[in-house]
Amino acid sequence: LNGRLQAYAQNTHHWNTDHGKVYLTAGMRLNWWSFTNEVLPSPRMSVVWMPGWKRDFTFRVATGIYYQAPFYKELRQTLQDENGVYRIHLNNQLKAQRSYQLVLGSDYYFRAWGRPFKFTAEAYGKWIDRMESYTVDNVRVRYSGMNDSEGYAIGLDMKIMGELVPGADSCISYSAMRSRMRFLDDKHNLGWI
């Protein structure tokens, strides 16, 4: 028998200041899975500021801790016994991958060619621990079945949304990202890859 419990709570407060409107949203997601018996608290918070000097701009910052519970293929751990025989074991000690995230963003609302547009830009950083490494053999992906690595991702996303062609919503976007990982037991001295 396998079961999961999940709960989520969120609240938003807003107020007016001399410098504009401020929205504060805080929440908590809580997950539990009987297979791993792991309790995963995920707090998150965001602050949005709409400055009084220019209503066309919105600035925001968001942060939180996020978990990704393992899928079945990730739980599979290949073990070799003393006779050289391989067997598959489902690792119930495998922890959910965890990321600490920070996002800074801004929106700008404007008109061009008589139509409304929105420009959005976000910069983000994510630190990920308890990662599970994998190998790729052609189209086959084999997971290690262990929390044996850590990593990070940083990036920038920019997007213009609106009616570039009259009557049709469309967007132009640009994204740049750098992500790296390293093994916790770096016996081959690979470093960040």
Q: Which residue ranges define each predicted feature?
A:
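Outer-membrane beta-barrel translocator/channel fold
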Residues: 52-102, 108-109
